[in-house]
Amino acid sequence: MGWQKLFVASATVAIASTLVWDSTAQAADLSYSKMYVFGDSLSDSGNIYNSSPQQFPTYYFNGRFSNGPNWVDYLAQDLGLTPTTFITQQSTPLPFPQIPTQSVNFAFGGATTGLDNTITQIAPGLQQQVQAYMGGLLTTNQTADPNALYILWAGANDYLPTESTWFTPPTTANQTINNISFALNSLLNAGAKQIAVANLPSLGQLPLTFGTQDETRLNNLAQAHNLALGQTINSLSQSYNAKIVSLNFASLFADAVNNPGNYNFTNVTQGCLLVQCQNPDQFLFWDFIHPTTEGHKLLAKEAYSALRTSVPEPGEELGLLLLGVLGAASIYKRKKSLDSLALSGKIVSD
């Protein structure tokens, strides 16, 4: 009777699961309570602008380092979130907030993965950004929201040539990866469970560096960085039993450079501003380093796709369930056959 009950119960679950297919599919869509962003100018949605005299060149859009919204803006829109900037108005020194009650973008243009910022010494690097968020948690004795999405993209300013007199770029990726690992450990130890980490494009392919003596060296650094970053992500994911999604922006940039026509680009080596272009949507880069808003759209699409892929499809879950039902049915059938044989005296039970 126990085996019969098991089979009936399993079949009932399978039927019920089929009936709620639509609601299961909806539940599998991306859903985060908040979004916290840490990084540099590629993700900054106005922090450097708001912490400065607010006299950015007019060719930068609303404090972004592009001609329009950046990838964080687009991704937030796709996720139905509206992160505010960490600095909401001109403020010196930087404020130390309480725990945010909404999504917050902590990214600052010029941030390195350490303590330095290559634009101004009063602006934070990645470590201070994470600690600013952590400070709010400590003040209120709370843990990180496990249902929030934490985004981290930094490292380019560690390696690229700089006019900064207080920061010297490293010659290897070791310290940069250690810095990123430290930031990730801080978030994970605080309770973060869903993190997205982006790797670096080939830094020798930027308008700033392409065709210069630094091209090969920077490409090699980016490659070493991405390899070590992938290993770090895998290790931390297992250690903390957390979901750390890798955003492979390196592959996307490489494909855009090698196959520009696939993305409707006609120029992937020069910044639109540098040649006074009339059609920025056909350019991958806006200036020496940063993508156009069209380029940022591609980044947001790639990020959303990576996040979406990390969520199990409803069909996968149902497939596993049905497999379990079939297994139960097989066991039940075998058990029934054995019972029949035992009753006929053809086998002897222990």
Where are these regions (language model features)?
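Conserved active-site regions of diverse hydrolases
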Residues: G2-W3, F7, A11-S17, W21-G315
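A cross-kingdom C-terminal cell-surface attachment/processing module
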Residues: V311, G315-K335
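Extended rod-forming repeat segments used as scaffolds/tethers
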Residues: T165, I233, L320-L322, K346
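Compositionally biased, intrinsically disordered low-complexity regions
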Residues: Q4, F65, E317, L326-A329, ...
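C-terminal membrane-anchoring or membrane-association module
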Residues: A329-D350
